[in-house]
Regions:
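Short linear loop/turn motifs
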Residues: 205-213, 325-328
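Active-site neighborhoods of enzyme catalytic cores
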Residues: 80, 214, 346
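Residue-level structural signal for beta-strand termini and adjacent loop
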Residues: 27-28, 98-99, 175
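A conserved beta-strand/loop element that lines the FAD pocket in flavoprotein oxidoreductases
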Residues: 202
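Active-site core segments that coordinate phosphate-bearing ligands/cofactors
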Residues: 1-2, 14, 106, 113-170, ...
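Carbohydrate-associated surface elements
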Residues: 102
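N-terminal glycine/serine-rich phosphate-binding loop of ATP-dependent small-molecule kinases
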Residues: 1-95, 107, 123, 150, ...
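Conserved residues at the C-terminal ends of beta-strands
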Residues: 78, 210, 405
Length: 432
């Protein structure tokens, strides 16, 4: 049984352990879960809502596929990254989770980066503290002391669902690293940042391996879900490391890519290195071990598929994406000099958090038409992702293969071939 704890819904999937075949899936709710925004820039969700919809999704997928809970041999969990869940000694949720897209702790992270110094932060954390989980917890300490004083443990979203299933509060090294609570040099929780923030390390959950026994379903959780008591939870990872794992991206030189609304490139390195300009994030990958370093380097470009969607909208002809791809393919590579830079969806970290906006260059009214715009937009997206790949290469990652799901921008031969040509990497597409 695989669980995906997303921002919009909870998905449950059944996979045959022998054949790898997906038996069935279900999601809850059928619409979208609410994001609570008490103030501009804030984003919260109630963790108990995740748990309620997890129960519904599990019960639904078992019933719809006529599967008895006793047939489930193991449970794996993928989840939205970076969120902060706080519970008391009774494991009761103390406040809404502060989720990944909440920006209230940005300045706290900036102050820590300046206070500790760039060299110290990057050499130990491989990242700026930024707006990640540790900084969100510091925000709670500064602004909600009455809540902070009651906290017994803090968790990530996937840790919370695992806790509701098993009764055990656990996390992983990969999970701590995505919260910027992992010291890559020392190989332990990041005391330098925790001490700077005045956070007691005892608030952190004990770690378990990403793969392996992490607890078993309690009788109470079994009664709520239809699972069998004693069913083991054996895997958990954040959504981006998990996506890389699903594409068999486990070794140096292998890259996982997505190009939906935003684009993500996630590469694996066997070195403890950082970008001096902090344009990318580094996390402990799912198959890391002390004897075999596997770190995941992640970069995001906000303006990828959303720009293609904008082109589709302004074309105003009820075009399908497949038709746009065909039209784009009628123009030669290079779009006869037309350039489109896809940075129109907010600040881009790979550009030092600047927000240049989308721009069109070299437009000639006598040469360029709709087909040129469609192609130039897709080429611009490919070059934006390659800019990030070059940062990885500067960090010592040798890019050999890019693996992606058959979805979104990768359905376009123009986009896929452009990315392959400029990166020099083979592109392999999979049904995921």
């Amino acid at each position: 049984l695989g669980l995906d704890i997303g921002t919009s819904s909870i998905k449950a999937s059944l996979v045959n352990a022998q054949s790898g075949e997906c038996v069935g899936s279900a999601q809850s709710p059928s619409t979208e879960m609410k994001i609570i925004a008490p103030q501009p820039g804030w984003a919260e969700q109630d963790p108990e809502t995740w748990w309620q919809h997890t129960q519904l999704a599990i019960a639904s997928v078992l019933k719809e596929n006529n599967i008895d809970g006793a047939q489930i041999s193991a449970i794996g969990i993928s989840y939205q990254m970076h969120g902060l869940v706080c519970v008391d000694k009774e494991l009761k949720v103390l406040r809404n989770a502060i989720i990944w897209c909440d920006s209230r702790a940005v300045e706290i992270g900036n102050q820590a980066f300046a206070g500790l110094g760039a060299e110290k932060c990057l050499s130990h954390l491989l990242n700026s503290p930024g707006n990640f989980t540790a900084s969100k917890l510091r925000w709670v300490k500064e602004n909600e002391s009455h809540i902070y004083s009651q906290i017994d443990k803090v968790m990530l979203p996937g840790d919370f669902i695992a806790m509701r299933l098993t009764g055990d509060v656990r996390t992983t090294e990969s999970g701590l690293s995505e919260g910027i609570i992992w010291d890559f040099t020392a190989g332990r929780p990041a005391e330098i940042l925790l001490n700077y923030y005045g956070i007691d390390q005892g608030l952190l959950a004990a770690t378990v391996p990403t793969f392996g026994f992490q607890g078993e379903v309690t009788p109470e959780a079994a009664g709520l879900t239809g699972l069998q008591p004693g069913t083991p939870v054996c895997y958990r990872a954040g959504d981006q490391p998990n996506n890389a794992f699903s594409l068999n991206v486990l070794n140096p030189g292998e890259i996982a890519a997505t190009a939906g609304t935003s684009g993500v490139v996630y590469g694996v390195s066997d070195q403890v290195k950082y970008d001096p300009q902090s344009r990318v994030n580094t996390f402990v990958h799912v198959n890391h071990s002390p004897g075999a370093i596997r770190n995941g380097i992640l970069l995001c470009v906000n303006g990828t598929g959303i720009m293609n969607a904008w082109m589709k909208q302004v074309a105003g002809e009820n075009l399908k994406y497949s038709e746009m791809n065909e039209i784009a393919a009628t123009v030669k590579p290079g779009s006869e000099g037309l350039l489109v830079l896809p940075f129109g969806n907010g600040a881009e970290r790979v550009l030092g958090n600047r927000e240049p906006g989308c721009s069109i260059h070299n437009l000639n009214f006598n040469i360029h038409g709709k087909a040129h715009l469609f192609r130039a937009a897709q080429e611009g997206i490919a070059f934006a992702l390659y800019y990030g790949i070059r940062i990885m290469q500067q960090m010592g990652v040798e890019v050999k293969v890019i693996r992606a799901g058959k979805a979104n921008m990768f359905l376009s031969p123009v986009f896929s071939q452009t990315l392959a040509d400029i990166s020099g990497a083979d592109i392999e597409l999979y049904n995921t």
